[in-house]
Regions:
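Anion-binding alpha/beta catalytic cores of soluble intermediary-metabolism enzymes, centered on
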Residues: 1-10, 39-151
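N-terminal phosphate-binding or glycine-rich loops at protein starts, especially the Walker A/P-loop
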Residues: 1-36
Length: 151
């Protein structure tokens, strides 16, 4: 099975190499197809991600992305937000649990936080009112709110 691997920036390539080693050691039938994206790639090429990335994700149906950086003040669009919006991966699911043998201030935690991942400030509707005042619109639609509630 083919899958897209986006190593990303910073520690991303190291994490991605570990993922490749682990999946190989587990004898998983995954052929990782690598594409570059993120701040380092943008600095080199002026593009957010390597050509063909979106088509590959659509073809292979899934991707694993390492951490990517977004330079501040460059007009560079976040890879994370752009991919979320492109593929409508709207649910950010964060499970929280205690683990046996690990001390914690609180006991018996078993909680899942689900956050809408494509609207609010993620829409990127921002502009300067003056040289000293910026405005960011927190757009939230009924459609997206209903969708995340039903998730």
């Amino acid at each position: 099975m083919k899958a897209v691997l986006i190593p990303g920036d910073g520690i991303g390539p190291e994490i991605s190499a570990s993922v490749e080693s682990i999946t190989k050691a587990m004898n998983l039938d995954i052929e990782w197809v690598k594409y570059r994206a993120g701040a380092e790639y943008a600095k080199e090429t002026g593009e957010v991600w390597e050509p063909g990335l979106v088509d590959a994700i659509e073809e292979y149906k899934w991707a694993l992305k390492g951490p990517t950086a977004t330079p501040i003040g460059t007009g560079f669009r976040s890879v994370n937000v752009a991919l979320r919006q492109k593929f409508s991966t709207y649910a950010n699911v964060r499970p929280l649990r205690n683990f046996k043998g690990i001390d914690s201030k609180y006991e018996n935690i078993d909680l899942v936080i689900i956050r809408e991942n494509t609207e609010d400030l993620y829409k990127g509707i921002e502009y300067m009112l003056t040289d000293d005042i910026a405005n960011g619109v927190k757009l939230i639609t009924r459609e997206a709110s209903t969708r995340i509630c039903r998730y």
